[in-house]
């Protein structure tokens, strides 16, 4: 039995979960609505405010999908109640981020500013720099965990951190392996 898959999911107050045909799960909550089609073999049961996920057999595929299915449903419930966020840090001289309406405008050392339109259900929060050398914080916020992660990865890919000075966009919790520069020539 999957340790994660066998745990029941408690549906909080104010959240409505609908399990349709072919395991089409819809979760409605205070922050919005999420719909996801899950694997049709998995058995999803809702009894009152508790959801359980069971697998039809002990095949390798069903064992691997058991915990995944439970986690996907739980992530949808957390998304519509609390939301998801991913924090990024922008390091580098002249690297800036600001919001123009909902559009994120990044100055990352290119000859032009990079404009990013947010996908539906995604928004950005730009922090303030405390001093000129401090990194700038940027947070991607949304209700779909997968979409928040993809958007954060897309922003990071515009200027990934480089190993010599650490300039670029990195995740807040990411550690960069720094390299020593080349040794100077003796005179």
Curated annotation (Swiss-Prot):
<dbReference type="InterPro" id="IPR019906">
    <property type="entry name" value="Ribosomal_uL6_bac-type"/>
</dbReference>
<dbReference type="GO" id="GO:0019843">
    <property type="term" value="F:rRNA binding"/>
</dbReference>
<comment type="similarity">
    <text>Belongs to the universal ribosomal protein uL6 family.</text>
</comment>
<dbReference type="GO" id="GO:0003735">
    <property type="term" value="F:structural constituent of ribosome"/>
</dbReference>
<dbReference type="GO" id="GO:0022625">
    <property type="term" value="C:cytosolic large ribosomal subunit"/>
</dbReference>
<keyword id="KW-0694">RNA-binding</keyword>
<dbReference type="InterPro" id="IPR002358">
    <property type="entry name" value="Ribosomal_uL6_CS"/>
</dbReference>
<comment type="function">
    <text>This protein binds to the 23S rRNA, and is important in its secondary structure. It is located near the subunit interface in the base of the L7/L12 stalk, and near the tRNA binding site of the peptidyltransferase center.</text>
</comment>
<dbReference type="InterPro" id="IPR020040">
    <property type="entry name" value="Ribosomal_uL6_a/b-dom"/>
</dbReference>
<comment type="subunit">
    <text>Part of the 50S ribosomal subunit.</text>
</comment>
<dbReference type="InterPro" id="IPR036789">
    <property type="entry name" value="Ribosomal_uL6-like_a/b-dom_sf"/>
</dbReference>
<dbReference type="Pfam" id="PF00347">
    <property type="entry name" value="Ribosomal_L6"/>
</dbReference>
<protein>
    <recommendedName>
        <fullName>Large ribosomal subunit protein uL6</fullName>
    </recommendedName>
</protein>
<keyword id="KW-0689">Ribosomal protein</keyword>
<keyword id="KW-0687">Ribonucleoprotein</keyword>
<dbReference type="GO" id="GO:0002181">
    <property type="term" value="P:cytoplasmic translation"/>
</dbReference>
<keyword id="KW-0699">rRNA-binding</keyword>
<dbReference type="InterPro" id="IPR000702">
    <property type="entry name" value="Ribosomal_uL6-like"/>
</dbReference>
């Amino acid at each position: 039995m999957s340790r994660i898959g066998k745990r029941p999911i408690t549906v909080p107050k104010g959240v409505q979960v609908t399990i349709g045909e072919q395991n089409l799960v819809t979760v409605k909550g205070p922050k919005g609505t999420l719909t996801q089609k899950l694997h049709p073999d998995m058995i999803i049961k809702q009894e009152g405010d508790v959801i359980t996920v069971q697998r039809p057999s002990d095949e390798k595929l069903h064992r691997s999908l058991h915990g995944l299915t439970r986690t996907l449903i739980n992530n949808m419930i957390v998304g519509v109640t609390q939301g998801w966020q991913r924090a990024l840090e922008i390091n580098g001289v002249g690297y800036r981020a600001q919001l123009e309406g909902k559009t994120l405008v990044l100055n990352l050392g290119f000859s032009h500013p990079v404009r990013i339109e947010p996908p539906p259900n995604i928004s950005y929060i730009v922090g303030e720099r405390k001093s000129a050398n401090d990194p700038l914080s940027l947070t991607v916020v949304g209700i779909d965990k997968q979409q928040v992660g993809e958007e954060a990865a897309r922003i990071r890919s515009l200027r990934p951190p480089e190993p010599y000075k650490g300039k670029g966009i990195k995740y807040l919790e990411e550690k960069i392996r720094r390299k020593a520069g080349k040794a100077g020539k003796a005179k």
